[in-house]
Amino acid sequence: MVKEEEKDKVHFNHDDIQQKLDKKLGPEYISKRIGFGSSRVAYIEGWRAINLANQIFGYNGWSTEVKNIIVDFLDERQGKFSIGCTAIVRVSLADGTYREDIGYGAVENERRKPAAFERAKKSAVTDALKRCLRGFGNALGNCLYDKEFLSRIDKVKFDPPDFDEGNLFRPSDEISEYSRSNTIDNDNPAVKRQKLNNQNSIPDTNKVKYNGSAPAPAITYNNAPKKPVQSEERYAPNGSRGKENAQNKSENEDLLDDSFMFSDDLQDDELISLMNKNSSDPDRRFNNAPKENTGDITFVTARAADSYQSTENVPENLKFDPKYVPHSMKLTIDQNTSKHIPLSVLKEKGVTATSREAIYSRFAAKGKQIPNPIDDSTDSRLAENDKSNENDDTETSHSTEIEKSAISSVNNGTNISGSTESSVTTVPSHNSTSQTTNIEAKVDKADSQVSEKQSQKGIKYAPQVPVVHPNTSAAIPLNQNKPLRREVGRPKINNVGPKKPSPTP
């Protein structure tokens, strides 16, 4: 009788199991997918079937066994694999009852061969497992083959189950308190140190010895801090007490060996306990002077600092001085104002100039021409040359007019008329060529004098930069005649010119 009762405790009652298996599945357990011909197929997922089997039979009330797996076909086409597998699985209960069935799994167009085998075999075993569990009753999926039941279960409404955070399996549930206390000695030295500190912080009252003749002290409960009870160990001989202290100290040093530990290995609780220990030490003396209340810290710009400090009560040590200049910075003028640099400062820096205009003339404004930097001596020399050459300009202008008229008369084969007859005599025909060459030389000389005057005035133009070919890195002439050959890809352009006369018939 005792053995039968133990069996009933270990295994579920057969009547309860049969009652659960006779019930049909609710809509929460049924899933649907699209089958062949756009028809919807009802099925139960593999993980739901395993959960139902654990709830009905118990976690140790049933077992599975894969009898055989057969690869039906393996095709490879264009680097993709298609596999079909057949699996035979047996599900056995604790009393020896079992169900055995077949399952099939197929994978198509899988690029990786191992992944194709994995998916095909797993799907075959899962299919066989669900078919085996279906043989035990409606609650494990047999009701899904009843079409009348499926037509009615679609009309049943249900609310999805809420997510329960309290029903989660956490790491704290993994080990019991008893087993955790037994394995604490095998932890790292930081845990040992924490355990030792907790033991030292609690006064040991087991070693207290009272005199038998004296009455036992009455136990009182109050909120006052407890004082350590004086034991008779302090009245022990000095020799024995010193030996015990040395032995305890050596044991503590073995446990608190910090030779192989770093600051990162210390736990947060341990650091807090060490800080509390240091603060509670009566031998340490700290300065308990009240700290100055500096108030809230506010970030403002340098311009707004002066106005902010005038309205708010800012301590003197925290005020911002906008006129503060570090000793490492050497300034020539005051930075608070905008003014010209004194000439005395420029002379100290080695700049020799009589006026600021002479200095600023070297730096032209945007969009203007930059004149040549010319000294004062050259300016005076150019001024004298301009005065001396004023008369020359008038003479050269008059002579150039006469020379141009003479050139035109020579080219046309006529004499000079008008006012030029009084100043220029008629030139014989055989000396016309020499006369023209002399006139052209004078004109070139006049043009060169004009260009020299323009250059002396300091006008500077940027020279023409030669164009460099990107492939040959050679300069391309600026005035290069374009070839008449048409480039590839461009339309043909006819040259503008006189049309050829059409041939007459």
Curated annotation (Swiss-Prot):
Keywords, ordered alphabetically: DNA damage, DNA recombination, DNA repair, DNA-binding, Nucleus
Cross-referenced InterPro entries: DNA_recomb/repair_Rad52 (IPR004585), Rad52_fam (IPR041247), Rad52_Rad59_Rad22 (IPR007232), Rad52_Rad59_Rad22_sf (IPR042525)
Gene Ontology molecular function: DNA strand exchange activity; DNA/DNA annealing activity
Pfam families tied to this protein: Rad52_Rad22
SUPFAM superfamilies registered for this protein in UniProt: dsRNA-binding domain-like
DNA-binding region: 130-134
Functional note: Involved in DNA double-strand break (DSB) repair and recombination. Promotes the annealing of complementary single-stranded DNA and by stimulation of the RAD51 recombinase.
Similarity comment: Belongs to the RAD52 family.
This protein's name: DNA repair and recombination protein RAD52
Organism annotation: Candida glabrata (strain ATCC 2001 / BCRC 20586 / JCM 3761 / NBRC 0622 / NRRL Y-65 / CBS 138)
Name of the coding gene: RAD52
